[in-house]
């Protein structure tokens, strides 16, 4: 009775389970669809929908090709093996049991097995969409390799594709063969009887033909490997390209092996006809033996007994190929080398001819003054500046000035915890702040040429709102009717910034969320039901996301490697982020392969544990801008000779604008990118010599010195000194140019470590200011080579000299005030002036308080063996050169003062200021060392009142009042905390 009643219950649950499974599948499918549809909306709004559709189209097409190319052969192979099975096969008991298990599932398995392998193959094939599109749209480079005389585009665009196709086809044949063998064995077409293997005729034909196809593919693969020898590492990885043993043993050997593989394939076809396995077995054994003898032993013998006894002479021409290709592939072919016999004499007036350079020496370190920008220009906790600021230049009063710039962005962690605040109210940062790189105030603060809220200064009128930046929130919902309530907090205003001004976004910055369906899509994408439910969202609302400039450029130009340091500029009345993009390859024949992430790592940029970005070709092919207000991305084709860029222009037509579209103002802010320069300096450390013998023996290696100002933990390798932007006149230049430079020293060994300069590399980073035309010398590399017998101290040695100088040490002790302040050393700059090398290092002082910021108090200068430590750079230069350097620095008019607090930068500003040229907001007064308890209680009471007002405002739907109350609450809590810390 119990059993009978249970069966209907189980049957009744079956439809419910099926229904639940269908619903779950639909929900999952809709989540996936939401992600895809959100991508469509994002790309379409930005005007790059074609980029997304091209990627999807290529991926889907390759998936289908891969799926069918795998599934059909596997299915046909299994079907043929099954249909040609023996009718009355003699099976043992074990096979009988296998058949009994498999037979009920046979039909399903015959379709499922090919489908499963097809899915994996399709996914694998679709991942190669870039490789396929490069092959379909390949563009000749006009340069041929020295071994096979083939255009280098063959190696970059064609050879990887051919290898991928042959590898994929080989996988298809192997899986098909496994399917044939398994089916034939299961149904008795292949039987093991003692020591014999009996194969039916039909199975023999199928297996032999499949094996023949496989060996034919292996022959093609081996043949292609000839060409791969010129892009692979040779001589144990010493250099990239085919060496003597490769050219004279490996390449001919691979041609022979490819021919043998073709003969073996023919033997298998013959076996399919005549039914004898002797020929293919002998052929396969012969191929294995030949692979050992011709492919391995013979090249090893040539290397051991012919090359190694006379390696330098025999490998010379191949090292020469490597040198020429490497310098060409990394953009070093046209470098100008200038012998520089640096003097150490400090005679009066020595800098007179370099007066234009000394006037532009930057004393403001962008890696140090971030806290000063924050304390003087942040104004509110919900704003922030980055730790490492950027260097740019602006024309002020008819003169181009180096500046340190930063964008006042939102600080997402300080915008409150409510969803409304985080995504509707606090939506954007405000304005760009710029300070003269060559000046400081009398008390050591930056001299701002653009500052304050609202923004004012020398940069003129521009759109100050920053909706897109490096630290923007993950998403914001902006926009609305002009006549509607303004809920987006714009900037603090009123007396001491006590009030707030609100605004409504009026641009076209993101997809519209003007209907319920789109709101549902983005609610799923960001996993926030508030997007779907919030009644503050209207039919003109837009959702802006993916706001990081580098990320936006990377999405619309997926073929680019993006520079790690986008920088902001005011261009044509807008704040724009300028982003550099690189085209790279690791298939340039004979060019040395390098890990890019390792080459660009320094004290300001960390290196990943496992680099995965090998390159041996790089071009700065694209300059991009991202509008900070509406996020518009504009791509400019910068290197029009680059074959990789030309190829991608065929893939994504109309996405790149020509150089002629670059305005003169934008051109004046473009610069040579630091990551590209770091790659070039690392390669040049070995390839500054063109003599094959020197490369072979590693006799004249150079390296970049470690950053003398960086601190590293025990066991952590020292970080390299980053390159620095400066306006200076190098030997070979007729006037000062905005430049990027670095220095070289001999590499340290187990026995010695010489901290002396061997070279000085600079690149002209000034693109000019002519619309649509970059300066003729832009990107020109100049290498100053110092005599080997000179002992000009390198940055690390100069820093040691500074630290060990008695006078400097005594003054530093006074600045540290018994531990109440700390001394921060700025970037140690090196300049080729006065016939020698001048070192300049700003010295900052800051207190140990949480709200302190660094103040520029001293400048260290060294020339030869002499050291000066003065209040200003101008005074230090005169001190070094016996009272008269013959030139002036940017801080010549500064009269240093010593404030009562010691000039340590205590206190923070928290109110808006008008700013202006050369103006500096006055820091808010610091509280007394011992704040009364009633002050703390008053702050807590204010916080409680603000909290109640915020809750009441939310209840009434008044978002503006709620945001204002939330800000008062945050400030009151912060004030209470600071007061409690002082008790």
From Swiss-Prot:
Bias regions of kind Polar residues — which residues?
Answer: 699-714
Q: How does it sit in the membrane?
A: Multi-pass membrane protein
Got a GO cellular component term for this one? plasma membrane
Q: Where is the composition biased (Low complexity)?
A: 919-933
Membrane-traversing stretches: 16-36, 56-76, 108-128, 161-181, 205-225, 255-275, 281-301
| Residue stretches of biased makeup (Gly residues) | 902-918
Tell me the segments the record calls region Disordered. Answer: 699-718, 884-936
InterPro entries, from UniProt?
Answer: UPF0182 (IPR005372)
Question: Which keywords describe this protein according to UniProt?
Answer: Cell membrane, Membrane, Transmembrane, Transmembrane helix
Can you say where in the cell this protein is located? Answer: Cell membrane
The organism's superkingdom is given as Bacteria
Asked whether the keyword Zinc is assigned, the reply is no
Q: What Pfam families does UniProt report for this protein, alphabetically? A: UPF0182 (PF03699)
Q: Which family does it belong to?
A: Belongs to the UPF0182 family.
* HAMAP family for the chain: UPF0182
Name used for this protein in its record: UPF0182 protein CMM_1204
Q: Could you read off the lineage of the organism from its UniProt record?
A: Bacteria, Bacillati, Actinomycetota, Actinomycetes, Micrococcales
